[in-house]
Amino acid sequence: GTVRVFLDSPDNLLFQGKAEDFFRKPVEILSGDSSLGKHTESFYQYDASYFPIPFSKGFRMEWTGKISDIHFYHVGLRLYDNDQEVESFTRENFRKYKATMIRTDSLLRNPDHRPASGHYSSMNGEVRLEPGEQAVLMDLKGPSSITRFSLRADAGNLENALRQAVLRIWFDDSETAQVNAPLGDFFGAAPGINPYISLPFTVLTDGTMICRFEMPFSKNARIIIENHSAEKIKVSAEAIVARFRWKDGESMHFHALWSMDHDLTTSELDSRASDIPCLAAEGKGRIAGAAALIHNPSGVPTSWGNWWGEGDEKIFIDRDTFPSFFGTGSEDYFNYSWSSSRIFSYPYCGQPRNDGPGNRGYVSDFRWHISDDIPFRESACFLMELKHHGKVEGFSYGRIIYYYLLPGGNTVTGLFTAHDLREINYEPWMPEAFKGSDGWRFVQAEELARGNDRVSFEKDDFWAGSGVLNWIPASGQDVLKLNIPSDKEIRETRIGITLTHTPDSGSLTFRLNGEPVRFSGRDTLLVFTAAGRLLDNHFSGPVRLKKGSNELMIGMPGADGRKTAQIDFIWLRK
């Protein structure tokens, strides 16, 4: 469709044109300067644009098109008190504020490159904890503010340790900890170390985790680590502490509230969704972000079938009887769409972990409310619906809400139990034919491999059938041969292959019965990912299968004995 956008009066038409142009690239469209768009790319974050358009009197948007074709758009508005002066946007702003826009873009891309200002100091702490122990990591005196908090943990099983060691921070002798979350979950990318860069949080490949949310306090701050795991844990941390002028009645404490529900049974598309409580706070404050930490043990290997996020966010502010924020699906809240299985991160949103294939396994999503923080004067209630494409038992829904609250406010909090902090488990699974995978049958790659001294079989419940075929070719001349069976000749069909994407994965080529085959539309399939591991599905173009044995020959151009190919299973049409 098309949209028309008016600022302040019906005579002031700011834009008229394609809706997609306005929502996806307003800088290029409104400025007419494509080069400026390249210097402000961080304003566009997956399916969301964060380019601000201020107005002093009024805003009007009209959409024209076929109702049957429209999906939906989200438009976020921030309204100020009447005595607040606002300069309405004009195209002249691009010339006037060009340098500021470019600097802002640079800061969003590289949040640790901003110059330090004012009086600050670096405080360091280190603790070594036996199972069941707790220790004070830092004791800080105020009035001050933690402007950057970085932490690194070492343990034998780090994934479990980061879930079962708890970070608690008390500000100004509070009866309850304002920050109360598992060590890894606090940084928004659990379980384990899942590298990403955003404005308030970063996780580095070496395991360093960084928080840049400002944490002011008037008198003191105490940071404690509790070890509920069976691991010995070493935790090292640094806090950058700046002078802060605390103002009673204005200054707020930072809060991070974590909660977890295990062993849920998800509702299907045609059944009623259940609401997952994320936050219930009383007092004056601002919501600054949210993260979802999911375990989705569905056996369906496609997003259309294993997608967990059809539920909507509902955020009630103050005396709302109907939510001020009522979403259109969990992925839309997290700024992506169509149940994306990509690993990605932006300044305000990201998905640093998604095991796959599709959206199964462990998943972490986050959204930070920085330029769109959500203020409340009396109360805030944040609910997220859980609605799945299918019925799944053993589902886990963890979440953490980040917010600021004026001292004297209250938050409904629950104490952690050993069950909440249980170990990270990978349960055996097999691919199921349902919705997007309906009409397919699946064969484990281990059953199809022919003799090859560069092949091994790795056991782990991360993969279907509790194992994966691991091939490490010595050179680009090596090939891996898989035997694809067919009980009849099929003149035209497709085959699929589910591969593990890792930092050590090589690029792959394919030939079926001697003929080149393209997978995912590519002659050479790229299966590299910068960090971690994920399973992804790739499908061939049209191929012909003969009755009996069909040879799928896989090559790895440029192989050097270090790059790997990990093949989980093959898809064949029923």
Enumerate the predicted regions with their spans.
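Beta-strand-centric surfaces of beta-sandwich/beta-rich domains
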Residues: 1-432, 499
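Extracytoplasmic
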Residues: 307, 312-316, 423-574
